[in-house]
Every structure is written in C-alpha cells, then in structure tokens.
C-alpha cells in the first residue's frame, strides 16, 4: 500500500472505500496502543473524483504540504479534449499566506532602493515559491504573481514622479521588460502590470 508522510501528516492510497475504512480502523488501534489518536478533523476519506470516477462522495479534496488536491478541468495534449482529472495546485491557504508575506514587504515604500536591489532582495524568495508551488498547475499562481507587479508599479510611481500617468508608465514598463526580461524571477511567467489610478 502506497503512502506519503511528512512530520505528523500522511496520505494513504486505497483502492476502495471499504479498504480505506479498514486501514483507518487499523491505524486508530495502532495509534491508541501507543497513547496517540488520529486527528478527528484532519482524518478523512477522500474520493479522488475524475472523468473515470464519477460517484458522489462527501469529500473530494484535501490539502497536503501546501498543495490542494481536487478535481480540475484538464485538456488533452494529444487531441485537445477537455476532461476532469484529480490534480494538485497551490492551496488557497498557501496563496493567502504568500500574499500576506508580500504585503508585509511594503515594497512600494522602499523608494530609496533601486530596481536591481529590489530584484536581488525578492528574487530568491519568489523563485523558491515558483519552484515549489509551480511544479503542478502553475497558472494558479499567476494572479498572485501579478500582484507583485502591482507593488512594483506602485513603487515606480512613487519613486519617479514622471511615471504617474498611465501612458508614461506603460512606455517605461514595456521598455524595462524588453531590456531586462529576467530582472525579476516571476517575469518568466507573468510580465503584465496592473494599473490602479
């Protein structure tokens, strides 16, 4: 029987609901024999619903190591057919946590810092997130990465008064991205800016 474990979290793969309930019962007995017990809220049987498994079940998603596993719409690379597969992507909780972290940077207030210094500061962190959470369904991170561009936009408009109009800022941003396409790690995936008037 396959399983993954990290610290006190584990995912056990079962073929049928009956098998899952038997494993649950056996684990409960084992844990109790050493004075422990399974977490009542976190211990669940999850139905990995997809195009081939279409039954109705109470729980069809779970979170593990910052990823949410759930049914997702997919497209066949062979013939373009749309189907449902059970796949991981960055979890909403992890996204919220990273967004909070970026807000705490208060990047737009660091106007004594230049672009190169900003990039040197945030790139190792953002690249780490991209490498870890972007392994599967990385598009789920795009709106979050665009938010980093929003903070960069605010930083530039505060630092350079001439960039406070949309037209001038757009020319500056597009020129910067054309000259230095790899300046910020997340530009490998998302280069557009968001303008807030």
List PLM regions with ranges.
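Non-catalytic terminal/accessory segments
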Residues: 1-197
């Amino acid at each position: 029987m396959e399983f993954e474990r990290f610290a006190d979290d584990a995912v056990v793969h079962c073929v049928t609901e009956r098998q899952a309930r038997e494993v649950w019962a056996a684990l409960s007995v084992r844990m109790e024999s050493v004075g422990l017990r399974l977490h009542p809220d976190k211990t669940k049987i999850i139905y990995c619903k997809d195009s081939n498994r279409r039954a109705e079940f109470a729980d069809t998603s779970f979170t593990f190591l910052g990823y949410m596993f759930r049914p997702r719409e997919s497209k066949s690379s062979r013939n373009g057919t749309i189907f449902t597969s059970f796949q991981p992507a960055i979890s909403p909780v992890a996204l919220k946590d990273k967004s909070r972290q970026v807000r705490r940077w208060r990047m737009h207030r660091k106007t004594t810092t230049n672009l190169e210094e900003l990039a040197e500061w945030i790139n190792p962190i953002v690249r780490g997130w991209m490498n870890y959470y972007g392994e599967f369904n990385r598009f789920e991170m795009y709106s979050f990465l665009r938010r980093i561009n929003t903070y960069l936009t605010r930083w530039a408009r505060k630092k350079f008064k001439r960039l406070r109009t949309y037209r001038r800022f757009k020319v500056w941003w597009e020129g910067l991205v054309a000259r230095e396409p790899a300046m910020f790690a997340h530009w490998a995936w998302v280069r557009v800016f968001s303008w807030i008037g």
